[in-house]
């Protein structure tokens, strides 16, 4: 059976069928379609009358509501409901052109009102500042002198004190010291009598704390300071000169010191540089290794040159 011809098998069936057809009265000849032309309802255009009685494949749909069931066309039309209309979706809410224009107009009006309020607030603040500053200046002008006038008066006093002639070593030093003390006391009294100036708006911080402005330092003030320190050192040298011991002997040594300032009727004191002790002239000579001498001032020498310790 396996060795039989496949086409012969179909041919035998064809002959048998032809015999049956010949034996039948009005049956048409059945032709087997051997081609591969496939379709849903069979081969298109072949045996349409006979194939109409056979059940055909039903075309399916992607929508569940539109699926058709096997049956006649009238039954399908009656059982199938009409498809629902599809709704068009969008990401933004539907609104008319009038609503959109109305919303834009409201936004523009709000912006204009906010801008107008800011301008009014700024103008009011500027006018208040200008009025307050002008009234403050008018009130303070007749009461307090300006900083330039104070600086000029101090400079004039310093020039007048420096232009005074020197009358002598001791008298000149005393005059300079007294004049400098008077100038400093006058300046202190002026500074104490003057109230602190009103702080400017530029030195204020956002939290209301007033920041103090540092005083201005000019070249003239610096030169005056250096000259005053030089005069002070010179006056100290004149009041307390440097002395040294002049002793001859095997155990003698040179000791430096300075003559401490003393008044009339007081005993002369010499400060020893090596130990810092206050000694009398006899003790100073004895400290240098001279022993007990009758006239100790002869063994003490005054050095006119400034010392390295000052």
Swiss-Prot record:
InterPro entries (UniProt xref): Ninja_fam, Ninja_motif, NLS_NINJA_AFP-like, TDBD
Cellular compartments annotated: Nucleus
Record bears the keyword Glycoprotein: no
Family membership: Belongs to the Ninja family.
Name of the molecule in the record: Ninja-family protein 3
Polar residues compositional bias, start-end: 156-166, 176-193
Species of the source: Triticum aestivum
Start-end of Basic and acidic residues biased regions: 99-108
Entry's Gene Ontology cellular component terms: nucleus
Top-level taxon: Eukaryota
PANTHER family for the chain: AFP HOMOLOG 2, NINJA-FAMILY PROTEIN AFP3
Protein keywords: Nucleus
GO BP annotations, alphabetical order: negative regulation of DNA-templated transcription; signal transduction
Region entry Disordered, spans: 1-29, 68-140, 156-215
């Amino acid at each position: 059976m396996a060795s039989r011809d496949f086409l012969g098998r179909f041919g035998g069936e064809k002959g048998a069928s032809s015999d049956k057809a010949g034996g039948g009265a009005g049956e048409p000849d059945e032709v087997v379609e051997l081609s591969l032309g496939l379709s849903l309802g069979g081969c298109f255009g072949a045996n349409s009358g006979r194939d109409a009685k056979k059940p055909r494949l039903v075309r399916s749909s992607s929508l569940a509501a539109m699926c058709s069931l096997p049956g006649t066309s009238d039954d399908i039309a009656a059982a199938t409901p009409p498809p629902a209309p599809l709704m068009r979706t969008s990401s933004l809410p539907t609104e008319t052109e009038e609503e959109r224009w109305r919303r834009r107009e409201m936004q523009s009006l709000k912006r204009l009102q906010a801008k107008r309020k800011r301008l009014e607030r700024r103008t009011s603040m500027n006018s208040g500042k200008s009025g307050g500053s002008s009234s403050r200046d008018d009130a303070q002008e007749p009461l307090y002198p300006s900083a330039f006038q104070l600086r000029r008066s101090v400079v004039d006093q310093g020039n007048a004190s420096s232009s005074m002639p020197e009358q002598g070593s001791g008298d000149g030093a005393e005059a300079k010291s007294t004049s400098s003390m008077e100038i400093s006391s006058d300046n202190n009294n002026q500074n104490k009598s003057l109230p602190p100036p009103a702080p400017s708006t530029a030195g204020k911080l956002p939290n209301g704390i007033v920041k103090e402005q540092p005083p201005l330092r000019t070249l003239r003030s610096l030169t005056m300071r250096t000259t005053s320190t030089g005069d002070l050192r010179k006056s100290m040298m004149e009041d307390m000169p440097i002395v040294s011991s002049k002793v001859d002997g095997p155990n003698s040594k040179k000791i430096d010191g300075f003559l401490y300032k003393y008044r009339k009727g007081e005993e002369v004191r010499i400060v020893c540089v090596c130990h810092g002790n206050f000694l009398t002239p006899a003790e100073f000579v004895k400290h240098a290794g001279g022993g007990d001498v009758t006239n100790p001032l002869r063994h003490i020498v005054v050095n006119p040159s400034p010392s390295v310790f000052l």
